[in-house]
């Protein structure tokens, strides 16, 4: 059984060293924590509840946390991080 505990990187493949785990970004883009997925609905709920996790640009705009969903370059992660791509915000 996989040990889905501790720190991880969303860029690590597979996340947390096992395809049985998820890496949930925590505040910073390059650091997260490992967890056991308890089904697809829990991933969807996690994305809905986190202000910066997204699956689409529209989701970022609805959450008010940006207008661009930057997907992680990791095919084990079905989500990305919201950014504001407006040049005035830079």
Curated annotation (Swiss-Prot):
Residues 1 form the signal peptide. Pfam families: Albumin_I, Albumin_I_a. Residues 40-47 form a propeptide. Disulfide bonds join 4-21, 8-23, 16-34. Keywords: Disulfide bond, Knottin, Seed storage protein, Signal, Storage protein, Toxin. The C-terminal glycine may be removed from A1b. GO terms for molecular function: nutrient reservoir activity; toxin activity. It comes from the Eukaryota. The presence of a 'disulfide through disulfide knot' structurally defines this protein as a knottin. A1b binds to basic 7S globulin (BG) and stimulates its phosphorylation activity. This is Albumin-1. It comes from Phaseolus angularis. The gene is LEG.
